[in-house]
């Protein structure tokens, strides 16, 4: 199961880098939850999750997996996400914790990061 979970994490990072909210949301189960960052309002359901990722539409985004641990339908992983937005570049290295169903869809995602973790530089 851990190989399948690691593959699902890779698909998620590829989808985030692709910048398509619909493609990202398709990786989630219909009744999945998302908390990004931890402490923010809980986002529930695929449609709401697609809306959440709407900020990425058309943005130039890259991702890099830094570490992943996967076991029994769960994954904890750190990664770097770089977003070029006009004249500024945003870089953050969150730690995401996800759970997956038997079909490999994300059932929950919690992202551990705070605004102070984001580095903003001129592009």
Curated annotation (Swiss-Prot):
The active site is at 12 (proton donor), 36 (proton acceptor). Gene3D superfamilies: 3.10.450.50. Its EC number is 5.3.3.1. GO terms for biological process: steroid metabolic process. It catalyses: a 3-oxo-Delta(5)-steroid = a 3-oxo-Delta(4)-steroid. One of its GO terms (molecular function) is steroid Delta-isomerase activity. InterPro entries: NTF2-like_dom_sf (IPR032710), SnoaL-like (IPR037401). Keywords: Isomerase, Lipid metabolism, Steroid metabolism. Substrate binds at residue 96. Signal peptide: none annotated. Homodimer. This is Steroid Delta-isomerase. The lineage of its organism: Bacteria, Bacillati, Actinomycetota, Actinomycetes, Propionibacteriales. The gene is ksdI.
